[in-house]
Amino acid sequence: MLDSAKSSFPHISPLLTPLMYRLVGDIVLRRYFRTLEVQGQEQIPKRGPVILAPTHRSRWDALIIPYVTGRRVSGRDLYYMVSHDEMLGLQGWVIGQCGGFPVNTQAPSVSALRTGVDLLRQGQALVVFPEGNIFRDRQIHPLKPGLARLALQAAQRCQEAIQILPILLDYAQPYPQWGSEVKVIIGAPLSTGNYDVTHPKSAAQELTSDLLRALQQLQEGRSLLCLA
């Protein structure tokens, strides 16, 4: 079904993207947040197809993720699968110029999935928020099955396994205010090579469960650090 669907490649502006890295990273984030702590950047794959799977806590997420994992850290530009709401307004325009494309989080279209598969087939780094929507209660919510299905479908068409990178975004406030704190914890990647892609339904369920467990472990580790 995906093979017959058309996809339009997301756009990464050669002029705007490096400018936004400097503007967002060096000015906006550093001035807005009192501290932005990052752990686990050594886990980021420097090559090959990878899905970055962050928790979703704020509209700041789409700005923080490239700053802590993108071209300045890994040498890679990131593509984004984001909700239609996040493609609205000035932020949406910027995201659209920097690799973002919309997806219906309740019922992803075939064309959106096709775009994701094509990006991974080309060895790109794709950001997918597995919870689907923004949740501000600092709890890990049930994951949508789309990420696992996308990864496994891409794995069937690639010459190498797809890596899935769990990322925890933890804000000190539900609605981050000026001078607040944020912590980003990056876990060890999962690999589609550990799942039987010839049984896609059970493999997707297993991968989704493993990703949920990985995010929960990052959350538990963050809680233990706070108690220490």
Show where each model-derived region lies.
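Structural motif corresponding to alpha-helix initiation and N-cap regions
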Residues: 38, 88, 110-113
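Helix-to-loop junction immediately C-terminal to a conserved catalytic motif
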Residues: 18-19, 25-56
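Non-catalytic C-terminal accessory region of glycerolipid acyltransferases
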Residues: 2-12, 16, 110-228
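A conditional alpha-helix N-cap/helix-loop micro-motif detector
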Residues: 34, 106-110
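Short hydrophobic helices that act as membrane-entry/anchoring signals
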Residues: 10, 14-30, 92, 96
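Catalytic core of membrane glycerolipid acyltransferases/transacylases, capturing the structured
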Residues: 3, 46-107
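Short, well-ordered coil/turn elements that cap or connect secondary structure elements
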Residues: 30-33, 75, 95-97, 159
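Generic preference for hydrophobic
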Residues: 38, 52, 80-81, 164, ...
